[in-house]
Amino acid sequence: MKLRANRVGEQMKKELGDIISRKIKDPRVGFVTVTDVQVSRDLQIATVYISVLGDEEQKENTLKGLAKAKGFIRSEIGQRIRLRKTPEISFEFDESIGYGHRIDTLLHEINKEGKREE
């Protein structure tokens, strides 16, 4: 059953990217990348992880815009993916990209310090 949830999540990820970039006209929604979609085993709840280009204010405005368009997005998903019931959607920021960048920066600093000591 977990395999089906993963397949639905991947399909939703692809469709959400298209819907957010082409169908949503809210000016608060800026450049958004859907990084992952986690769907519950019973296919009732979908958590959408997004990455937003911009500062904290832009991120918050984007989240508000997506929350406002949640019903429209869910209906579009329902039309594009054949399921008995379209999952309830919630949006969250994907912090893993920021963590990865921070780790990369730290590794570069360690590497520079190691070269200086030699």
From Swiss-Prot:
Q: Is the keyword Cytoplasm in the record?
A: yes
Listed SUPFAM superfamilies: Ribosome-binding factor A, RbfA
Which InterPro entries does the record associate with it? KH_dom-like_a/b, RbfA, RbfA_dom_sf, Ribosome-bd_factorA_CS
**Example GO molecular function term?**
ribosomal small subunit binding
Gene Ontology terms: cellular component: cytosol
Keywords assigned by UniProt? Cytoplasm, Ribosome biogenesis
Q: What superkingdom does the record give? A: Bacteria
Give the principal location in a single coarse category: cytoplasm
Where does it live in the cell?
A: Cytoplasm
UniProt keyword Hydrolase present: no
User: Which biological process annotations from GO are given for this protein?
Assistant: maturation of SSU-rRNA
Q: Which family does it belong to?
A: Belongs to the RbfA family.
Q: Briefly state the protein's biological role.
A: One of several proteins that assist in the late maturation steps of the functional core of the 30S ribosomal subunit. Associates with free 30S ribosomal subunits (but not with 30S subunits that are part of 70S ribosomes or polysomes). Required for efficient processing of 16S rRNA. May interact with the 5'-terminal helix region of 16S rRNA.
Q: How does it assemble?
A: Monomer. Binds 30S ribosomal subunits, but not 50S ribosomal subunits or 70S ribosomes.
Which NCBIfam families does the record associate with it? rbfA (TIGR00082)
- Return the protein name: Ribosome-binding factor A
Please give the organism: Bacillus anthracis
Designated gene of the protein: rbfA
